[in-house]
Amino acid sequence: MAETRTSITVRPDLSDYRGLLKALNQMDKEAQFELKNDVYSLSAWTAQGIERAGFAHPIYPKQAAIVARTVRPARDRVPTVYVGGGKGRASGGANAGQLLFGNEFGGDRNAFGNLNAFRNGGYRFPPRTSREGRGNTGYWIFPTLKGMQPEIKKRWFAAVNRVMDNWARYS
């Protein structure tokens, strides 16, 4: 039986930043701790933006609220946010992770149920979102991240530069 994913870890593509990460590994523990604290506040800001978008989601708002309650920041050198997991339960017993992908990307309109099965006409998730690149656009997590991305990048570079300048000055 195939495994199903029940969470998303959102972090930047680090393929272009391998040299930077190696330099960050050379810093002492105090400088790394300072960087992780700065980046954690950025991750918390990002998680708060995603969570607010979930609570404001107009289509299937109860599902989105269950998923939004699971958004949490991670303490790392790069901005990282976790969404989903086993917490939160819907009335049918599904946890937030099981609702995550259907609520974010939608579902096919011919899948599961009939017009008499559910109050909403037989559909468990909103209509599938349009294609974009290798996947779908999403309803609230990925559009929110896309809008926040320039500010996240700017704040992360500022935090890294500030910590590296302090480390270079005092080491």
Regions found by a protein language model. Name each.
Residues A2-D38:
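Long, hydrophobic N-terminal alpha-helical segment
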Residues A2-L14, A53-S171:
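Charged, low-complexity interaction tracts
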Residues D28-A31, I50-G54:
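Alpha-helix capping/termination and helix-coil
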Residues L35-I50, I152:
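Non-globular disordered terminal and juxtamembrane segments underlying protein topogenesis/assembly
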